[in-house]
Amino acid sequence: MTQAHTVTTISAESLRQTARPHALPDDAKWRVDDVAALFALPFNDLLFRAQQVHREHFDANTVQLSTLLSIKTGGCEEDCGYCPQSAHHDAGVKAEKLMALEEVLDAARAAKANGATRFCMGAAWRSPKDRHLEPVMDMVREVKAMGLETCVTLGMLKAEQAQQLKEAGLDYYNHNLDTSPEFYGKIITTRTYQDRLDTIGYVRDAGINVCCGGIVGMGESREARAGLIAQLANMDPYPESVPINNLVQVEGTPLAGTEALDPFEFVRTIAVARITMPRAMVRLSAGREAMDEALQALCFMAGANSIFYGEKLLTTGNPQADRDRALLARLDIRAEGYAG
């Protein structure tokens, strides 16, 4: 899409200073209306365009395999309506202590043996206390020493904590926006949108790659999906890693029973993310358990080039590794760096 106006993006500093993060400037690179226009393209036209953009920057027949391990499950103080790990919801997830280092390393070794090149560690905290950070940094150092790309998601960070993680060698920090600013208050009340932008700014300032995406299928409108993508695409730079999650409904959470998103709308979201953030790793994340193989293939056509791989994605199911390998083989898609 050719833009006649001057490009304006959102810097790390302005992420922290903007009082109304949804008030994108008139000359933003991707206005919400521009993104909505992409969503409205005929399906085949949208996928064709996304595949063209994808091929300009990536091998269209290669994906990265990522594994996500919950290193500290349950008991989170936040009230995110989708999350079974929230202490506010009765979803049957018990609070657990932080995993021991050797348990994490065993999981990382298994992930690498199964072909993963990226290992993500998630802890259900509102924000990590300083005493929690040292053991997590040990995990980062040891997992990185195995030759795996490292990512953690620990909740909100302070600037000095982001710097400590950088010094430990962390490659990526994940902190999702979840949805558009306008819809956000219907999903979460214990953390503001600006809180999220602040953490992303600290991560960026520390020199850590940003992993930031969202969740669709939470009852939001297409305009809200366009608003999420616009927020991401106007960051300067936009995130290196963009996970797109399809809501996994868990009994006991407020979003259980939400009308499911049309599968083709999910594919459209992947395609729009690819077009607006052409060099990002667009990750097909939560919700794959409910997707048939044809839908996953469409997601790859739309520009997804990473999947989360293994038995569990935090506390919800994920297709088994053997099934994933079989699907990739049928599609002649190679796993990055895997010779198995």
From Swiss-Prot:
SUPFAM superfamilies found in the cross-reference section: Radical SAM enzymes
Gene Ontology terms describing biological process: biotin biosynthetic process
Known role: Catalyzes the conversion of dethiobiotin (DTB) to biotin by the insertion of a sulfur atom into dethiobiotin via a radical-based mechanism.
Cofactor binding annotation: Binds 1 [4Fe-4S] cluster. The cluster is coordinated with 3 cysteines and an exchangeable S-adenosyl-L-methionine. Binds 1 [2Fe-2S] cluster. The cluster is coordinated with 3 cysteines and 1 arginine.
Protein name, as recorded: Biotin synthase
Residues in coiled coil: none
Similarity comment text for this entry: Belongs to the radical SAM superfamily. Biotin synthase family.
Organism: Cupriavidus taiwanensis (strain DSM 17343 / BCRC 17206 / CCUG 44338 / CIP 107171 / LMG 19424 / R1)
Domain of life: Bacteria
